[in-house]
């Protein structure tokens, strides 16, 4: 009886734990605003190699995710769109910095990016926010100034690299404080990507200089939010789209040395080249396959599934992927000392993530999660339903102060295991006890009573 009582108490406790609500059930009207900031090309391991006093202050009172596994190709436009849609590039259609759509016969480049045609295959979070009856804002996030699915942001302005970080942030904080229905804002900054391309990530002198500037922007961000009485009241996420790899003149792959220039059209260049064969596709593919030991060639349908880069009409018939640090050119020289776009399993391609605000744990660190997981997290923070996506809220819920996560699940599992063992032993104990006190005549229970009872087994 005593063991049974203990079991009942344990089961009751576990029942309460398991049935307790795990979601942040705040409606979007109650949820604080969310600010998403991207520092383009911020490689994850910069955090280990350089000093970031302001950024460290930011995540010491919040969350740090050491690495994000981003999407392939590890380029700016595909990854910024994945962050706000939760989709792989093949799903949202923003596949590269230069694209060609063979059905519409249209060309895309970063200098010609305002046609909604290229963006309408997905729904970015700012569209969902406005569909929910709230407002969103953006300071130069890729695609934020485009009319997507017949939605144009109320608060935005076109990309202009001459606009300072302070001015971009100033617009965001002004909009947030004057419009209480503004629930989401995004801000984009070009560095350290620009310097990484120009000098290469191995140039520690130049990278130390630009990363000090970036850390200064983080410091200003905290000061400005505090001045506007937003610090600690809104949720802030700082992240990036990709990392950066060092390139050199000694690591160049010249395609014209392998195939006739007249046999192919090059849509996107390096380090992932998109090829349209103008002659026999198999011949062109075979020549490219044997072109260089540091170059992998794939027919579109043979691109590895893990890259999620085959199921879209904008992906060209032949895809070339250079090894880390190698550069693909037609016949020219090295275009830049640093580059990205390589295989998304490479640590050099990974960005980081830091978060701060009332929804986030304090001093919490994670090793990694997928960049597409950020989208369902942001929808949860704002309190809006996510669109279909490739991410998982379960992967990121441990970052939140009100969420149960892996440690608790393990503890509950251990308790349940102990309960099963105790229950088994209790049942065996009772069976043995009943057997010891039972009648010596094994068939006595089957004897009928004198009153004609015909249900002897239903005692």
From Swiss-Prot:
Residues 430-459 are cytoplasmic. This is Bis(5'-adenosyl)-triphosphatase enpp4. Zn(2+) 2 binds at residues 193, 197, 340. Hydrolyzes extracellular Ap3A into AMP and ADP, and Ap4A into AMP and ATP. Ap3A and Ap4A are diadenosine polyphosphates thought to induce proliferation of vascular smooth muscle cells. Acts as a procoagulant, mediating platelet aggregation at the site of nascent thrombus via release of ADP from Ap3A and activation of ADP receptors. It comes from Danio rerio. The chain crosses the membrane at residues 409-429. Residues 20-408 are extracellular. It is found in: Cell membrane. The active site is at residue 76. Glycans are attached at residues 25, 112, 150, 171, 203, 287, 390. It holds the Pfam family Phosphodiest. Belongs to the nucleotide pyrophosphatase/phosphodiesterase family. Binds 2 Zn(2+) ions per subunit. It is a single-pass type I membrane protein. Disulfide bonds join 258-291, 398-405. Residues 1-19 form the signal peptide. Its cofactor is Zn(2+). One of its GO terms (molecular function) is metal ion binding. InterPro entries: Alkaline_phosphatase_core_sf, Phosphodiest/P_Trfase. It catalyses: P(1),P(3)-bis(5'-adenosyl) triphosphate + H2O = AMP + ADP + 2 H(+). Its EC number is 3.6.1.29. Keywords: Blood coagulation, Cell membrane, Disulfide bond, Glycoprotein, Hemostasis, Hydrolase, Membrane, Metal-binding, Signal, Transmembrane, Transmembrane helix, Zinc. It comes from the Eukaryota. Its main location: membrane. Zn(2+) 1 binds at residues 40, 76, 241-242. GO terms for cellular component: plasma membrane. GO terms for biological process: blood coagulation. The gene is enpp4.
């Amino acid at each position: 009886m005593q063991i049974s009582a203990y079991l009942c108490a344990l089961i009751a406790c576990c029942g309460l734990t398991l049935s307790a609500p795990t979601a942040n059930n705040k409606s979007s009207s109650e949820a604080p605003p969310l600010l998403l900031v991207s520092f383009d090309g911020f490689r994850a391991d910069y955090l280990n190699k350089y000093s970031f006093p302001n950024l460290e202050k930011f995540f010491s009172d919040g969350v740090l995710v050491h690495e994000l596994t981003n999407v392939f190709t590890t380029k700016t436009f595909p990854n910024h769109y994945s962050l706000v849609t939760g989709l792989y590039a093949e799903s949202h259609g923003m596949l590269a910095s230069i694209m060609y759509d063979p059905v519409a016969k249209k060309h895309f480049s970063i200098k010609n990016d305002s046609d909604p045609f290229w963006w309408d295959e997905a729904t970015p979070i700012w569209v969902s926010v406005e569909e929910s009856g709230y407002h969103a804002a953006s300071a130069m996030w890729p695609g934020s100034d485009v009319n997507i699915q017949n939605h144009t942001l109320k608060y935005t302005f076109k990309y202009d690299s001459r606009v300072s970080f302070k001015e971009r942030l100033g617009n965001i904080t002004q909009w947030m404080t004057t419009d209480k229905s503004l629930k989401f804002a995004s801000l984009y900054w070009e560095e350290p990507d620009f310097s990484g391309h120009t000098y290469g990530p191995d140039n520690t002198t130049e990278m130390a200089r630009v990363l000090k500037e970036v850390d200064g922007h983080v410091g200003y961000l905290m000061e400005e939010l505090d001045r506007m009485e937003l610090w600690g009241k809104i949720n802030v996420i700082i992240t990036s789209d990709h990392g950066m790899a060092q390139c050199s003149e000694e690591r160049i792959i010249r395609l014209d040395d392998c195939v006739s220039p007249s046999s192919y059209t090059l849509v996107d260049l390096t380090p992932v080249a998109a090829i349209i064969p103008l002659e026999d596709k198999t011949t062109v593919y075979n020549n490219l396959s044997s072109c260089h030991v540091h170059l992998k060639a794939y027919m579109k349908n043979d691109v590895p599934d893990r890259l999620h880069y085959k199921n879209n009409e904008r992906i060209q018939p032949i895809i070339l992927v250079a090894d880390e640090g190698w550069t693909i050119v037609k016949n020219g020289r090295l275009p830049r000392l640093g580059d990205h776009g390589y295989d998304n399993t490479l640590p050099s391609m990974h960005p980081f993530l830091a978060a701060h605000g009332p929804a986030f744990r304090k001093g919490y660190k994670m090793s990694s999660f997928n960049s597409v997981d950020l989208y369902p997290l942001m929808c949860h923070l704002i309190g809006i339903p996510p669109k279909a996506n490739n991410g998982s809220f379960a992967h990121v819920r441990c970052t939140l102060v009100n969420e149960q996560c892996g440690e608790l699940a393990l503890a509950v599992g251990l308790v349940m295991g102990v309960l099963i063992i105790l229950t088994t032993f209790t049942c065996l104990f009772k069976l043995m006890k009943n057997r010891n006190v039972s009648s010596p005549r094994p068939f006595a229970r089957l004897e009928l009573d004198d009153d004609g009872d015909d249900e002897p087994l239903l005692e």
